[in-house]
């Protein structure tokens, strides 16, 4: 007889309480499609800082909001875009050009292999 998997869920607030300043955080979604906005809002609400954000493969509004809120120190992504809405995400562009965040821009293949190597 096969044992059924037990559901494992956690409240969003509790999940984000396990994240500390300076940690590396991964977010999924693609551009502005299906980003985990409830998690993003909670990270901002809890005032986390200096995060390294592995987002993508192509990051979007979730990354831009975290950057604009001052939560991010480094972004690892193939790009941060709002596509037809605004092109390059505005907070990303401003913070990257001014040197307020560091950026490891890598194509999707390198992004994928780096994640796989770290697993």
What is each stretch, according to the model?
Residues 2-119:
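Conserved alpha/beta enzyme-core scaffold
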């Amino acid at each position: 007889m096969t044992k059924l998997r037990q559901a494992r869920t956690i409240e969003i607030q509790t999940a984000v309480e396990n994240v500390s300043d300076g940690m590396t955080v991964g977010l999924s979604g693609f551009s502005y499609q299906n980003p985990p906005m409830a998690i993003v809002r909670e990270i901002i609400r809890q005032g986390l800082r200096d995060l390294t954000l592995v987002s993508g493969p192509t990051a979007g509004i979730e990354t831009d909001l975290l950057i604009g809120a001052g939560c991010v120190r480094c972004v690892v992504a193939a790009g941060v875009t709002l596509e037809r809405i605004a092109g390059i995400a505005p907070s990303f562009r401003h913070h990257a050009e001014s040197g307020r965040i560091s950026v490891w821009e890598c194509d999707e293949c390198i992004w994928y292999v780096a994640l796989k190597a770290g697993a």
